[in-house]
Amino acid sequence: MKGYYHISSHGLEKNDIFKKKEDFVAGMNDIAICVLGFDVIILCFCLMSNHFHFVLYGTMSECRRFSEEYKRRCAMRMKLAGGEVQGMRGVEVKIAFVDCQEYLENVIAYVLRNPLAAGILLLPYHYPWSSAALYFNGGIQQTGESLNEMSERKRFRILKSRVPVPDSYLVDGQGMILPSCYVDSKAVEQVFRHPSRFMMSLARKIENDVEIQLGVAEQVSMTDQEILTQLGDLIRNEFQKESISELSMEQRIRLCLLMKRNFRAGIKQIARITRLDPETVAKVV
């Protein structure tokens, strides 16, 4: 039986899936290729540096197969790009059935709000590695070059695959297949019915509600690098110091609590950044 499903990968703690722009572009293209092999419809998605989210329509088995294939492609790319041996091995990919209209609206907003919740100072519509810009946009058509009109060599250089693609697949100037080619934006517009309702959902802070329902409230949502970019301001505001090395042991203990609360950082992640023993951090948080 077909239905709506939320796919979410557990955040990597020691590495990133997408480290640079080229990785994100490849990750977006992987979505476009993966969806061709399964009987699923993509309503929305968001790629973060260390995890990903999708809301799909299909059977549970097809949605699961799609998510596992996408995870496999991510792992292959990580290994080829940096020699990462572990890649995505052991990374849990959750699949949750969306059982009502309210939950569907909330989980779509949750997926598209991910960058904002992670402290990235962009409206969801302007985050380039998600489908947020596709909805209620007045029918603006994205333009690009047709993949099927390219030479075979150029096409393979972009896709890293020889899989046949529809004539509707267009590529932008950075070699990325336009999300409008493979995301069913009209289905999402039918869910929300009006742009004001969609905007209100994106404006609400719904992370706790959705994560409790998903059972992933303890999931790491930020990488070490993302935390470190904000940690300096936190230390200056709370302790009037410039770096962790200037903090006393008592202040480092308090910093553990602040990192847990502000960044939802895990025990091992806090220990790495503060250079405290994981057992000490566990007792504190």
Q: What kind of feature is each model-predicted range?
A:
Residues 1-44, 59-285:
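Short Pro-Cys-Gly-centered "Cys-loop" motif that presents a nucleophilic cysteine in a tight turn
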Residues 50-58:
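Short beta-strand->loop micro-motif that forms the acidic, two-metal-ion catalytic signature
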